[in-house]
């Protein structure tokens, strides 16, 4: 029933809860929905509804993720919560649920744990730009000094992974106490209860500290080529989904990837067999290009605003390798393994030159189910950039999923 009043008039931000298992991420997610539901800005979700997260498939990998949505006075949020640690790792790497920012949940009673570190590292590697911290289970800590120590430890950990550890807002509270109070008093407002107030304080920090992301439509134009046709008398048409930006008839563009980059001009844009003046992010369109033969362009190239993307052959990637149960390989692989890397619309063969563990040590052998950093050299240059997702395939089946953490050349 309450569905209808979610009008998208406010800026939209994707966020998620991250942190160690059992530190209270799901309880916090439930507490946020209950608290904002009292203002009519969310649909209250119980812990069980979020915890029983449905399975999703992203790039051939099964992930359990719960999605909730809510509003604050200034924004509309889509919030993702993964119950299991493995689901988190997979979600972060596949980008199944993109995050513009995260709420790092740390138990004040336990302090940072190994998974806390791993999630902060992953957030850094896969490009979750900003974090806000919720020190949970404050009700279980009697000693103020202990709370301060945990906060210092968290700030130091964030700084170690290149986040602004000194500036990140840290809010202490108890998701469980807030949830219990809201369950008994579903109309409770700010000022009624200290634990509920901590949830308001957290959301105010998220509102002010996590910036509104630049919308795809405001970024420079890019479309990955999926198919190419010649139309007699009109020239060559490349079709695909416009990934970002706006393209207008008469715009100068570049064809990037696989071969030498070359300039051309857009002479027409078509959608659903109709001619348009412009195409924008999200559109599936056909783009007519001046002076380009059908043989000059192929799937896997991108058409982009001049100078905004370059072709590369070597990169570092953070990769999750599918387990045997997930349909991945049954056997390990080693240095100089040569699978295909599926980027945007095409497979490119590449050689894996080395593997690195989180602590920077070299790894010789990679097992199905591992998460690993790898250096890859592609046989053809293609338009890639930091933060892009890719799949690793072998004979057409996905055996791994990754994100580009650094462009080398």
Curated annotation (Swiss-Prot):
Mg(2+) binds at residue 26. Its main location: cytoplasm. GTP binds at residues 19-26, 81-85, 136-139. The keyword Magnesium applies. Residues 81-84 are annotated as: G3. One of its GO terms (molecular function) is GTPase activity. Keywords: Cytoplasm, Elongation factor, GTP-binding, Hydrolase, Magnesium, Metal-binding, Nucleotide-binding, Protein biosynthesis. InterPro entries: EF-Tu_GTP-bd, EF-Tu_GTPase, EFTu-like_2, EFTU_2, G_TR_CS, P-loop_NTPase, Small_GTP-bd, T_Tr_GTP-bd_dom. Residues 19-26 are annotated as: G1. One of its GO terms (cellular component) is cytosol. Belongs to the TRAFAC class translation factor GTPase superfamily. Classic translation factor GTPase family. EF-Tu/EF-1A subfamily. Monomer. This is Elongation factor Tu. It comes from Microcystis aeruginosa (strain NIES-843 / IAM M-2473). The gene is tuf.
